[in-house]
Amino acid sequence: IMRSAMKNTISNVINAIIKKEKLIAVIVLIVMAAVGLAVTDGYGVHLDEAIELSILNSNIKEYSCYIPGKLGDKIANAARGVERISESDEKHHGIAAYYGYVFVRKLAQREPYQTLAFHMYTFCIFMLGVLALYGIVKLLTNSVWQSLFASLMLYRSPRMFGEGHYNNKDIVVMAFVLITIYFGLKMALERRYRYAILFAMAAAVATNTKIAGAWFYGIIGIGYLITLIRKKELTKRNISIG
């Protein structure tokens, strides 16, 4: 009787956990993000960080030249003393993923808060990659637990977690490649324009960060076309989405 009661109790607990699996996944992902952000202050300045920030400022200076009126002048003043990216030796180095950091930096105002904000911003990009991996595995397996396990494996890798706070090249391109794959799968499965647009945008940022990001854009595009041919679904709408 006791053994039967114990089995029933364990079964009830497992069923209760399964029913709350999505909530548990959300809580775990939030805790992962919170822990990562909480320890950001423990990471120092990366070797290339000053150069990357200089490239970002040069990009902003370049854009200010094409914005008319007071807004363009205001942006140009903020980037005073910085050469335009078109005149820089670093003009082939992209940093599109960090355009949003320009607004975050204004809130931070001064050092050391700007460096801290830069590292937190970088970690947020890493977490977007973790979420994208969760989404990819969920699409492929339809399992919350397998998706969460895959996300934790990436997150708990010491190298990935650590560099997720300051590596603004390799970690960023990895994150946006994962995002590209996720939206590419969503586009292929659901055939909606919004996923095609998000897929293209994520691929553009990945490619801007490192040219290797273009490979995944091309591979997914070719895979989508092959799928349409195999399923004999080469309609105008499906082709236009791709």
Task: Explain the meaning of each model-derived region.
Residues 1-35, 128-131, 138-139, 143-145, ...:
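Start-transfer (signal-anchor) and selected internal transmembrane alpha helices
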Residues 6-10, 183-192, 216-242:
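Perimembrane helix-loop-helix junctions
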Residues 40-47, 65-99:
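Membrane-proximal lumenal/periplasmic loop motifs of glycosylation machinery
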Residues 46, 165-172:
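Short acidic/glycine- and proline-prone juxtamembrane loop motifs at membrane-interface regions
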Residues 120-141, 179-183:
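Transmembrane-helix motifs of polytopic, lipid-linked glycan transferases
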Residues 133-156, 189-194, 198:
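Transmembrane-helix signature of polytopic, membrane-embedded enzymes
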Residues 150-155, 162, 182, 203, ...:
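Short helix- or helix-capping micro-motifs
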Residues 172-189, 195-203:
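Specific aromatic-rich, kink-prone transmembrane helix
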